[in-house]
């Protein structure tokens, strides 16, 4: 429902722009099914490209390694290595002795289990705050509870929660 609403908003705005430019109207046809299918993004495209049925991967990204949640000594955080340069930077910071094939994302994808196992062993020994500090400049962030996310200083600064007639509610992000 939420994804469909977001797509509907985009469609309505596009139709309004089209009407403004051409004076003609548009018919919008949107379905929950179509929007849910479009949200499959990487997994669906991988199926179409390879013919292979994707398997459950938890929080892991199907095409990037490492790009998933890892457990630290005090909770979970997400590490999102999106390039070989970020990988190399992390390897240098953590002083990881790794295989040459891991220097490329394709090599890390092929050896996903061993790459992730290596990192799980490292990350479990220190706190999330420690890893955020060590990995500054490399995309990573804690996995928050809903309460932590709502009370986070960024949520507070951005006004993520409104009070309407004494009832707290999520704010419109726009």
Task: Describe each model-derived feature in a short phrase.
Residues 54-55, 65, 71-72, 114, ...:
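Terminal low-complexity tails and localization/encapsulation signals of metabolic enzymes
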Residues 65-138:
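Aromatic-enriched alpha-helical interface/lid elements that frame and gate functional surfaces
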Residues 136-150:
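Short, well-structured beta-strand/strand-turn elements
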Residues 60-62, 98, 167-168:
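A short catalytic or substrate-binding loop motif that flags glycine-/basic-rich loops and adjacent residues
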Residues 35, 84-86, 148:
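Short, solvent-exposed loop/turn segments at secondary-structure junctions
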Residues 1-77, 81-82:
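Active-site-adjacent "lid/gating" segments in soluble enzymes
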């Amino acid at each position: 429902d939420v994804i469909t609403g977001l797509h509907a908003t985009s469609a309505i705005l596009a139709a309004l722009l089209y009407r403004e430019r051409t004076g003609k109207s548009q018919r919008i046809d949107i379905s929950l099914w179509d929007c849910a299918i479009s949200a499959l993004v990487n997994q669906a495209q991988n199926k179409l490209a390879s013919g292979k049925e994707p398997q459950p991967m938890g929080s892991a990204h199907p095409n990037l390694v490492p790009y998933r949640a890892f457990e630290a000594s005090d909770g979970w955080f997400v590490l999102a290595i999106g390039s070989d340069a970020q990988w190399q930077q992390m390897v240098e910071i953590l002083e990881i002795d790794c295989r040459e094939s891991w220097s490329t994302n394709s090599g890390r994808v092929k050896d996903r289990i061993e790459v992730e196992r290596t990192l799980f062993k490292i990350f479990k020994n220190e706190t999330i705050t420690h890893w955020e500090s060590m990995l500054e400049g490399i995309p990573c962030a804690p996995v928050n509870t809903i309460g932590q996310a709502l009370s986070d200083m960024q949520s507070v600064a951005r006004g993520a929660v409104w009070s309407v007639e004494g009832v707290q509610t999520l704010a419109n992000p726009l």
